[in-house]
Amino acid sequence: MKTGNQFNTVALVGRSNTPGIAEPLATLADSIATLGFEVVFEGDTAREIGIAGYPALTPAEIGARADVAIVLGGDGTMLGIGRQLAPYRTPLIGINHGRLGFITDIAASDMQALVPVMLAGKFEREERSLLEARIVRDGEPIYHALAFNDVVVNRSGFSGMVELRASVDGRYMYNQRSDGLIVATPTGSTAYALSSAGPILHPQLAGIVLVPIAPHALSNRPIVLPDDSKIAIQIVGGRDVNVNFDMQSFTSLELNDTIEVRRSKHTVPFLHPIGYSYYTTLRKKLHWNEHASNEDDKAS
């Protein structure tokens, strides 16, 4: 296990069904092993790329055995393995092999230079919060899930508006007619919530944001809540209503079902290269107006 900031066992996780990912993963594995680290692979990744010579483990086995997981893929890959490793507090290093790369912040072209430095203990660490949600039907919980980005209650593409009753900490907030409601973490505030005109929350802000999706009343605006809030969303009206967790798992809902959402007790450690800036990520990914001559403020 760890000695200070040092790691012994490194797990590699790759984006599934991705052409061209086998070679960089194999190269990365060999280079890490050459440095003296034990390298293991997530089982599905190992099978898909057909790599041999390294143990293939389940996410639970990775959580129990690995000191750090390196994820080569897109944000969706990072979200998926992050939820599975959250109970084990396994730190994640994200290498972008997808499109956007908000949370996989290392370019694939930089991984051979940056990963050895980070494995030697030179990195910046931050904790990312998750949500836990459960569906209650007739007074009994019927489904439970974690979400890294968001919990989204919405209508299907062929039905009309839904009516939702929202309360926070047992206090009634409103009834809302809309296409749905997003409950997002700070990490998820730059995902679906942002496209629905929600605010950007810094990842270290202790908050949860509620963002209506195409509300009938324009006065239904996003609201940021303390991250210890307990949110309940009841299905009052509408047909074909679903709830999604990070857009990677979903279940159908019935009238009077209640979705209860709160901050999870788990957090996921993200490791970044020295000098990482969240604001640089925002500028690059959201294409904010910037001038090449601008730099971070100099320390006075």
Curated annotation (Swiss-Prot):
GO terms for molecular function: ATP binding; metal ion binding; NAD binding; NAD+ kinase activity. It catalyses: NAD(+) + ATP = ADP + NADP(+) + H(+). One of its GO terms (biological process) is NADP biosynthetic process. Gene3D superfamilies: Probable inorganic polyphosphate/atp-NAD kinase, domain 1, Probable inorganic polyphosphate/atp-NAD kinase, domain 2. Its EC number is 2.7.1.23. Its main location: cytoplasm. Its cofactor is a divalent metal cation. It is found in: Cytoplasm. GO terms for cellular component: cytoplasm. Pfam families: NAD_kinase, NAD_kinase_C. Keywords: ATP-binding, Cytoplasm, Kinase, NAD, NADP, Nucleotide-binding, Transferase. The keyword Iron-sulfur does not apply. SUPFAM superfamilies: NAD kinase/diacylglycerol kinase-like (SSF111331). NAD(+) binds at residues 75-76, 149-150, 177, 179, 190-195, 214, 248. The active site is at residue 75. Belongs to the NAD kinase family. Involved in the regulation of the intracellular balance of NAD and NADP, and is a key enzyme in the biosynthesis of NADP. Catalyzes specifically the phosphorylation on 2'-hydroxyl of the adenosine moiety of NAD to yield NADP. HAMAP family: NAD_kinase. This is NAD kinase.
